């Protein structure tokens, strides 16, 4: 498979203090990669570093073979979208306007939405199950609805790589199933690469091709879910949960 992103001795952290040892990982076209780890392990910092939202302490990130720093912000926004747990500051925007912002990398900030752009926006809202909220103020939504708005915004951005930090947070069970279906459709049919984080063990183990596991000040561990289970990595990090679960490769 074609490699779309690779890190070289990447150090992430703040004020010169690395959160974990050097990170050497890669993402390939069409893969769904899950990121696991306790709060404070550096998951959000890794997302922000890979998306150039913050600078690394050391090392480099290559996107499609080119140093991430050599892309302009406009170029980067056409290559990856980012869904964070942080929400927009201007909470009084309409749902439609927030999602529409995902189209601007394709149009330019001053360009007017075309009919086809508006249709893409409406389709994305329907895909995540909030078409009926198009004209609602963002501030009036529940946490789960706000999360769906941000996922819809990433969908309309239509990038080859999608980063999603805790996309299942605040979602009820039916909405989580919808999210899984969306990720698989994007990956298998449109060959998009998805990196998402979660504390949901079912999402991490059942619905990813690769799994990255982080812990404070520990090397990032990576492999298929099955490999990490067999190596005892999952047992080390999630022993209380795994003891109660039975996964298809354990049968």
State where each predicted segment sits.
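H-loop/switch region of ABC-family ATPase nucleotide-binding domains
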Residues: 198-199
């Amino acid at each position: 498979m074609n490699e779309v992103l690779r890190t070289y001795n990447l150090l992430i952290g703040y004020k010169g203090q690395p959160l974990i040892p050097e990170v050497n990982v890669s993402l390939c076209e069409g893969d769904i990669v899950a990121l696991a780890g306790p709060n404070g392990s550096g998951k959000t910092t890794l997302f922000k570093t890979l998306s150039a939202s913050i600078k690394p302490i050391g090392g480099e990130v290559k996107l499609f073979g080119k140093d991430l720093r050599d892309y302009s912000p406009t170029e980067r926004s056409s290559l990856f979208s980012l869904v964070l747990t942080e929400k927009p500051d201007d909470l009084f925007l309409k749902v439609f306007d927030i999602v529409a912002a995902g189209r601007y990398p394709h149009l330019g900030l001053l360009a007017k939405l075309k009919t086809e752009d508006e249709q893409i926006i409406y389709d994305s809202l329907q895909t995540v199950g909030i078409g009926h909220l198009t004209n609602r103020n963002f501030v009036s939504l529940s946490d789960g609805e706000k999360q769906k708005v941000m996922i819809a915004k990433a969908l309309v951005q239509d990038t080859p790589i999608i980063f999603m930090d805790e996309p299942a947070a605040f979602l009820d069970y039916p909405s989580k199933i919808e999210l899984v279906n969306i990720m698989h459709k994007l990956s298998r049919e449109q060959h998009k690469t998805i990196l998402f984080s979660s504390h949901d063990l079912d999402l991490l183990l059942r619905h990813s091709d690769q799994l990255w596991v982080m812990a404070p000040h520990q090397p990032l561990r990576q492999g298929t879910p099955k490999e990490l289970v067999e190596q005892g990595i999952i047992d080390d990090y999630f022993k209380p949960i795994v003891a109660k679960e039975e996964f298809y490769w354990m049968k």
